[in-house]
Swiss-Prot record:
GO terms for biological process: defense response to bacterium; killing of cells of another organism. This is Dermaseptin-8. Keywords: Amidation, Amphibian defense peptide, Antibiotic, Antimicrobial, Cytolysis, Hemolysis, Secreted. It is found in: Secreted. Belongs to the frog skin active peptide (FSAP) family. Dermaseptin subfamily.
Length: 32
């Protein structure tokens, strides 16, 4: 279903966003 597909995409984007945020935080800490 479209709703299930959109939910899957949203979950994937949230997962990727968390990973990117974690990496960005590490870069900021390393830069200090």
């Amino acid at each position: 279903s479209l709703r299930g597909f959109l939910k899957g995409v949203g979950t994937a984007l949230a997962g990727v966003g968390k990973v990117v945020a974690d990496q960005f935080d590490k870069l900021l800490q390393a830069g200090q």
